[in-house]
Amino acid sequence: MEFVAHAAAPDSPHSDSGGGGGGMATGATSASAAGASPSRYESQKRRDWNTFGQYLRNHRPPLSLARCSGAHVLEFLRYLDQFGKTKVHAPACPFFGHPAPPAPCPCPLRQAWGSLDALVGRLRAAYEENGGRPENNPFGARAVRLYLREVREHQARARGVSYEKKKRKKPPHPSSAAAAHDDAANGALHHHHHMPPPPPGAAA
């Protein structure tokens, strides 16, 4: 199984315009292409897939997708660190664990854990969409999962931030809220019209 490159995006201006009375067909094609333009996620996934394919071709020796393993995915993720924009403080840095350092420091810039985690998710999906078998997916390898966990824990300590997901409170169900409102209204109405009992010994 070889890497399937996407030479042009669906909305590329270099589409085949044809000749000889194809104006209306071209307009219809353009309109349908515009209506079926990929989502932001799909566009990013395609760019990531093309970037990974370029990395495999530039690898020494060049790698085919069929020979790609979790170890090669880790090489790719470490390669991307040189383009990172997230400051990750070293243990010896005085700002280690400081979420808002007051001054600059020489610590390196790295890819943020969240970016790497999202990238792996997109590439894992793209691998299978391009003919890869789920059981052979290198982006789902245990080594990749462990690496992402280590990056998350290290960056959380170095940057003094927490990556724990906050639990969102579920809003009350509309029907339940309406029922509660009706019950409260009925209770208030009933209380308003309920006459107090006569005092003991009152004349009938």
Curated annotation (Swiss-Prot):
The keyword Transmembrane does not apply. A motif (Nuclear localization signal) lies at residues 165-169. Pfam families: ALOG_dom. Transmembrane segments: none annotated. One of its GO terms (biological process) is mRNA transcription. InterPro entries: ALOG, ALOG_dom. Belongs to the plant homeotic and developmental regulators ALOG protein family. This is Protein G1-like5.
